[in-house]
Design a protein with these regions (language model features):
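Membrane-interface helix-loop-helix junctions at boundaries between adjacent transmembrane segments
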Residues: 1-63, 78-94
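Hydrophobic cores of alpha-helical transmembrane segments in multi-pass inner/ER membrane proteins
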Residues: 1-2, 25-32, 61-77, 101-103, ...
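Membrane-interface interhelical loops and short amphipathic "cap" helices
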Residues: 8-10, 39-57, 81-88, 109-125, ...
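Alpha-helical transmembrane segments of polytopic membrane proteins
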Residues: 22, 53-68, 122-135, 192-205, ...
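Hydrophobic alpha-helical transmembrane segments in multi-pass integral membrane proteins
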Residues: 34, 103-112, 170-181, 208-213, ...
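Membrane-embedded alpha-helical segments of integral membrane proteins
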Residues: 161-218
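Internal/C-terminal transmembrane anchor helices
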Residues: 222-248
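Soluble catalytic regions of membrane-associated enzymes that act on cell-envelope
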Residues: 246-297
Length: 297
């Protein structure tokens, strides 16, 4: 386990550096956008509307955004000491917030049987919120326990409480799956829902990985974080590569699902969302619409 932790430590450090660099670059991008807007407003006030119109062009905004974000990445990657200091500061803040976050999740689970699941799905945001909560929990646990090789960051009683709270992660995964399945049963597959299932699967595997670490090592479960994260990290890379390759084209899969709804009579031709095919499924959707148009008497 110690060998795994020592080999995992550089991966952990680089991952958090990249995360902080990305966040700082996004903040730099936000500042650049405000500067561009001020620029356009100032010149517009003196009767020069060229820049206001220029900043409304998609190609120009995309170019400026890419250059600003890329410039931020270049600058902040060179400030390693600053980035590491920010990472340590964030880790300290998250260390204070994690117990409160776990209390919130425990109270939520206790309240859920009294409110029922129906109200959770009423706004169509319940699944997303549960997945976001699971991601934040996993992120905070990693930020606090890091490689798992250091000494316990909490008093023993609080560490045991956090250990027990890890068993809530599979519960949130199960609730998220229920919400996803309900939407799929009603509206079939879309590109967004495929990505939602991919994200759910990744979060679910990490959740069960940590629970298995608790079952195997009990209170010493952080020592297995390096192994769990390394193995599942490779899985995440493989899934992302497949998801962006012809082997797992979500547009074609979504098209097949939507067309099956139409041909099976699950949805009438009048209620069929042809705009989704046209606007979201790119060329496969366009070709399918052409075929439907040719078949229409």
């Amino acid at each position: 386990v110690s060998d795994d932790a020592s080999g995992y430590e550089p991966l952990f450090i680089f991952s958090w550096r990249n995360l902080v660099v990305g966040a700082l670059s996004l903040a730099f991008l936000g500042g650049a956008i405000l500067m561009y807007l001020l620029w356009a407003a100032l010149f517009n006030e003196i009767g020069i509307g060229f820049f206001k119109e220029l900043f409304r062009k998609v190609w120009f905004v995309t170019l400026l955004g890419a250059l600003s974000f890329g410039g931020g990445v270049i600058v902040f990657r060179g400030l390693t000491d600053v980035v590491d200091s920010i990472s340590r500061l964030l880790s300290g803040i998250i260390k204070l917030l994690l117990p409160f976050l776990l209390v919130m999740t425990a109270v939520f689970l206790v309240a859920l049987p009294f409110t029922g699941l129906e109200i959770l799905w009423a706004t169509n945001q319940g699944t997303m919120l549960l997945m976001v909560l699971t991601f934040i929990l996993l992120l905070c646990i990693n930020a606090v326990y890091q490689t798992g090789a250091a000494e316990n960051p909490y008093p023993l009683w609080l560490h045991h409480a956090i250990t027990g709270a890890l068993f809530t992660l599979p519960i949130f995964s199960a609730l998220s799956f229920y919400g996803l399945y309900a939407r799929l049963d009603q509206y079939a597959w879309t590109v967004v829902r495929y990505w939602a299932v991919v994200i759910w699967l990744i979060l679910c595997l990490f959740s069960f990985g940590y629970v298995l670490a608790v079952i195997k090592c009990r209170a010493a479960w952080p020592t297995m974080m390096a192994s769990v994260n390394s193995i599942l990290g490779v899985f995440v890379i493989v899934v992302l590569l497949l998801s962006n390759s012809p082997l797992l084209d979500f547009r074609k899969l979504s098209l097949a699902s939507q067309m099956h709804r139409l041909t099976s009579g699950a949805v009438s031709p009048e209620d069929f969302d042809d705009q989704y095919l046209r606007n979201e499924l790119a060329r496969p959707g366009y070709l399918a619409l052409q075929e439907l148009t040719a078949q229409d008497p």
